[in-house]
Swiss-Prot record:
Belongs to the ABC transporter superfamily. Phosphonates importer (TC 3.A.1.9.1) family. Its EC number is 7.3.2.2. It is found in: Cell inner membrane. This is Phosphonates import ATP-binding protein PhnC. Its main location: membrane. Residues 5-253 form the ABC transporter domain. Part of the ABC transporter complex PhnCDE involved in phosphonates import. Responsible for energy coupling to the transport system. ATP binds at G37, P38, S39, G40, S41, G42, K43, S44. It is an enzyme of class 7 (translocase). The complex is composed of two ATP-binding proteins (PhnC), two transmembrane proteins (PhnE) and a solute-binding protein (PhnD). Gene3D superfamilies: P-loop containing nucleotide triphosphate hydrolases.
């Protein structure tokens, strides 16, 4: 299988706290992978490194590649990082949309990387680009909201607009950081259904960080679980059993309880 994301010996230290410890990870074309773990495990930190939003420690041998391009090496971003980012759609927990713009205009933002600069200054998008944006909204069930201001939408609807923007970008990889953390169960289901649909029908590789184990088991064939910055488990979701769940979550809770008692 073609390797889409390659992480080698990635470490990250914030002040004196080491968030990631020499992480190695390979993700293949067409996979939908859940990064799982309790708060502070390093899963969101790892995801941000994949698109170069943050850089790792300057440790020898550390390296991240995405779609065959270097994203960062030994704590330094690649000079052509924009080319890697152009192929990566990033979906944030807090939606990261422009509230004053319409739904359609927010989706068209996904085309900025492939639009001449002078046109972007005036928001001049072609008819073909607008048609593609409407098609992306249709894919996520949001076309009938196209001309509505995005600030009027619910959280789940805004998250689907963010996914449509990634489709407009023609991203080959989607990195979703806690996309359902603030959503009600029905909205969370719709968002995860949408991510699975584009993964299965468009062949887009999806990496999603989750707190909810049940969603990871239901939607992702592979789970990468992090515990205190280390890869604790990397394998089939079917083999992520109660014993592993207990060791991943409840042992962390016991450590926190002991710290409070002390």
């Amino acid at each position: 299988m073609q390797t889409i994301i390659c992480v080698e010996q990635l470490s990250k230290t914030f002040n004196q706290h080491q968030a990631l410890h020499a992480v190695d990870l390979n993700i293949h074309h067409g996979e939908m992978v859940a990064l799982l773990g309790p708060s502070g495990s390093g899963k969101s930190t790892l995801l941000r490194h994949l698109s170069g939003l943050i850089t790792g420690d300057k440790s020898a041998g550390s390296h991240i590649e995405l779609l065959g391009r270097t994203v960062q090496r030994e704590g330094r971003l690649a000079r052509d990082i924009r080319k890697s980012r152009a192929n990566t759609g990033y979906i944030f927990q807090q939606f990261n949309l422009v509230n004053r713009l319409s739904v359609l205009e927010n989706v068209l933002i996904g085309a900025l990387g492939s639009t001449p600069f002078w046109r972007t200054c005036f928001s001049w998008f072609t008819r073909e680009q607008k048609q593609r944006a409407l098609q992306a909204l249709t894919r996520v069930g949001m076309a009938h909201f196209a001309y509505q201001r995005v600030s009027t939408l619910s959280g789940g609807q805004q998250q689907r607009v963010a996914i449509a923007r990634a489709l407009m970008q023609q991203a080959k990889v989607i990195l979703a950081d806690e996309p359902i953390a603030s959503l009600d169960p029905e909205s969370a289901r719709i968002v995860m259904d949408t991510l699975r649909d584009i993964n299965q029908n468009d062949g887009i590789t999806v990496v999603v960080t989750l707190h909810q184990v049940d969603y990871a088991l239901r939607y992702c064939e592979r789970i990468v679980a992090l515990r205190q910055g280390h890869v604790f488990y990397d394998g089939s979701s079917q083999q992520f059993d109660n014993e592993r769940f207990d060791h991943l979550y409840r042992s962390i809770n016991r450590v926190e309880e002991n710290a409070k008692a002390a």
